[in-house]
């Protein structure tokens, strides 16, 4: 009961903070509510920062009229494909290189070089290879997700206790059994730690790709609004993307709790 009450109190204060931020935003852009401290024209604040009521009205108009569903579906499809493909390849390559020191040493400078490269500059190349459709956005998202997952899995496998490995080998564990019962459980916590960041990066890859070249998607809607200086629609697009990114992150957290039931929850180790 006490833990449930603490969670409710936390949610209350989180919502209260959100309400406070919205009120402050509204007060900042409504002419006459606050004295002008930067703009010579009191209407300029609304032009540059948007108005929360108009942003909410735009979001409502999108969903009530059905205009956004096709664009949102495209963006979510690109995001989920990039997230899934990047995660699968990141886990596979991370485990392989962690268990193959020779290959890891050989490929180490190349992996570091590609990781240091700003992946956004690859977007024009992907447009040439895959066109302006879903494929180029997925490819860009995969390059962002892959390295986050890869480095976490690589480190997680290498952090396996030598004592645990020695005990498993003494009990006659085969390489496949070691992978399933020792290496993978050790890497799982590292994998889920990376997935929370990967969700946002998958969205970044999809939206940036749409922004640079597309005819559909939420990034395309934001680009069109920017072209006519419609800041309210731009912010509305950001709000929609943020909301769905939080939903996907919540799904990852739910899966994590289901699969990592053996792991102590936050704060339990301190009580022990």
Regions found by a protein language model. Name each.
Residues 1-32:
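N-terminal signal-anchor/first transmembrane alpha helix
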Residues 2-4, 31-84:
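Periplasmic/extracellular loop-to-transmembrane helix junction in inner-membrane transport proteins
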Residues 30, 34, 95, 102-109, ...:
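Membrane-spanning helices that line or support transport/gating and their immediate boundary helices
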Residues 81-111:
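Transmembrane-helix boundary motif in ABC transporter permease subunits
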Residues 112-148, 155-156:
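Generic hydrophobic transmembrane alpha-helix motif, especially the helices
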Residues 139, 143, 175-209, 236, ...:
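Transmembrane alpha-helices
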Residues 152-197, 218, 222:
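Short cytoplasmic-facing helical segments at TM-TM junctions of multi-pass membrane proteins
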Residues 235-272:
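C-terminal transmembrane helix and the adjacent membrane-cytosol boundary/short C-terminal tail
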């Amino acid at each position: 009961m006490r833990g449930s009450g603490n969670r409710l109190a936390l949610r209350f204060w989180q919502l209260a903070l959100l309400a406070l931020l919205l009120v402050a935003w509204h007060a900042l852009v409504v002419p006459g509510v606050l004295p002008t401290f930067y703009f010579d024209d009191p209407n300029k604040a609304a032009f540059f920062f948007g108005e929360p009521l108009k942003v909410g009205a735009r979001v409502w108009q999108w969903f009530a009229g059905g205009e956004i569903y096709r664009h949102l579906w495209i963006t979510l499809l690109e995001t989920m494909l990039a997230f899934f493909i990047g995660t699968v390849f990141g886990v596979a390559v991370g485990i392989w290189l962690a268990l193959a020191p020779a290959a890891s040493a050989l490929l180490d400078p190349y992996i570091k070089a590609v990781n240091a490269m700003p992946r956004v500059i690859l977007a024009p190349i992907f447009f040439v290879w895959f066109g302006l459709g879903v494929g180029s956005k997925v490819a860009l998202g995969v390059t962002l997700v892959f390295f986050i997952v890869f480095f976490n899995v690589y480190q997680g496998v290498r952090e396996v206790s030598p004592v645990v490995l020695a005990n498993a080998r003494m009990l006659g564990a085969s390489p496949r059994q070691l992978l399933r019962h020792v290496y993978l459980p050790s890497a799982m916590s590292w994998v889920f730690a990376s997935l929370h960041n990967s969700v946002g990066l998958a969205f970044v890859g999809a939206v940036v790709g749409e922004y640079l070249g597309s005819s559909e998607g939420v990034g395309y809607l934001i680009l069109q609004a920017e072209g006519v200086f419609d800041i309210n629609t731009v912010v509305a697009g950001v709000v929609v993307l943020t909301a769905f990114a939080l939903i996907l992150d919540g799904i990852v957290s739910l899966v994590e709790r289901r699969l990592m039931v053996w792991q102590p929850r936050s704060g339990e180790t301190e009580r022990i």
